[in-house]
Amino acid sequence: MPSFDIVSKTDLAEVQNAIDGVLRELQNRFDFKGSKSTIERKENEITLHTEDKTKLSQLQEMVKGYFVRRKLDPGALDWGREENAAGGTLRQVVTVRQGIDQDLAKKIVKAVKDSKMKVQASIQGDELRITGKKIDDLQECIRLVKGLKIEQPLQYVNFRD
């Protein structure tokens, strides 16, 4: 029976390359000279430190820009709230989403079942498996999921006959 998986994975090596690009630009930009602006990554978290809101918003735009340049979807970033940090600086923690969370998986499964297509959707950990009798049904299901306007980037893998 034909099947495919819906996953949401972000290449962390490319994320690190994007962060390195932001760091290089931070060192060279005139408006950041002499400021206490830093960006660092630990696993799936990126931490932005800077002095004021305008610099923080510029830093956010730089991160988004470098994500696009590295062919990463900025929708994979979950922007935390801005917090006051030591020394009168601002801190923002950004999480890189990996995998499909349960709420989103349930939303996709519900949409597939409500469409009355001849496919079955099952949640397997942080990914979805869609199976059907015909490849055409699976392709129609992919079109349906793409049309759901989901912010998180999704990939369609393991397309099997």
Swiss-Prot record:
<dbReference type="InterPro" id="IPR007551">
    <property type="entry name" value="DUF520"/>
</dbReference>
<comment type="function">
    <text>Nucleotide-binding protein.</text>
</comment>
<dbReference type="Pfam" id="PF04461">
    <property type="entry name" value="DUF520"/>
</dbReference>
<protein>
    <recommendedName>
        <fullName>Nucleotide-binding protein RC1_3464</fullName>
    </recommendedName>
</protein>
<comment type="similarity">
    <text>Belongs to the YajQ family.</text>
</comment>
<dbReference type="InterPro" id="IPR036183">
    <property type="entry name" value="YajQ-like_sf"/>
</dbReference>
<dbReference type="InterPro" id="IPR035570">
    <property type="entry name" value="UPF0234_N"/>
</dbReference>
<dbReference type="GO" id="GO:0000166">
    <property type="term" value="F:nucleotide binding"/>
</dbReference>
<dbReference type="GO" id="GO:0005829">
    <property type="term" value="C:cytosol"/>
</dbReference>
<keyword id="KW-0547">Nucleotide-binding</keyword>
<dbReference type="InterPro" id="IPR035571">
    <property type="entry name" value="UPF0234-like_C"/>
</dbReference>
